[in-house]
Amino acid sequence: MGTARFLSAVLLLSVLLMVTFPALLSAEYHDGRVDICSLPSDSGDCLRFFEMWYFDGTTCTKFVYGGCGGNDNRFPTEKACMKRCAKA
């Protein structure tokens, strides 16, 4: 039973890394922290329907957020997105 539990843990860790690592590679870092404005849009894991805004590298764009999961490049309004991510 110990081997099966170990293999399950390894499989879970592998899946988490495959999901998380590409997003981290695409992000920009400032002072060792992820710049949330450089993250891709991410609708999350749930199936609800919330109109939100994300920064696409140039401007703020509307997208549908499912209500859970996702990343921090998600804002309730275009104004909030621009305030946080647009460079003067």
From Swiss-Prot:
- InterPro entries in UniProt: Kunitz_BPTI, Kunitz_BPTI_sf, Prtase_inh_Kunz-CS, TFPI/VKTCI-like
Alphabetized GO MF terms: potassium channel regulator activity; serine-type endopeptidase inhibitor activity; toxin activity
Q: Tell me, what is an example of a GO biological process annotation in this record?
A: envenomation resulting in negative regulation of voltage-gated potassium channel activity in another organism
- Residue ranges annotated as propeptide in the record: 28-33
Spell out the PANTHER family in the cross-references. Answer: KUNITZ-TYPE PROTEASE INHIBITOR-RELATED (PTHR10083), TISSUE FACTOR PATHWAY INHIBITOR (PTHR10083:SF328)
Q: What else is known?
A: Negative results: the recombinant protein does not show activity on Kv1.1/KCNA1, Kv1.2/KCNA2, Kv1.3/KCNA3, Kv2.1/KCNB1 and Kv4.3/KCND3 channels, as well as calcium (Cav) and sodium channels (Nav). It also does not show detectable activity against chymotrypsin, trypsin kallikrein, and thrombin.
Per its record, how is this protein called by name? Kunitz-type U15-theraphotoxin-Hs1g
User: Source species, please?
Assistant: Cyriopagopus schmidti
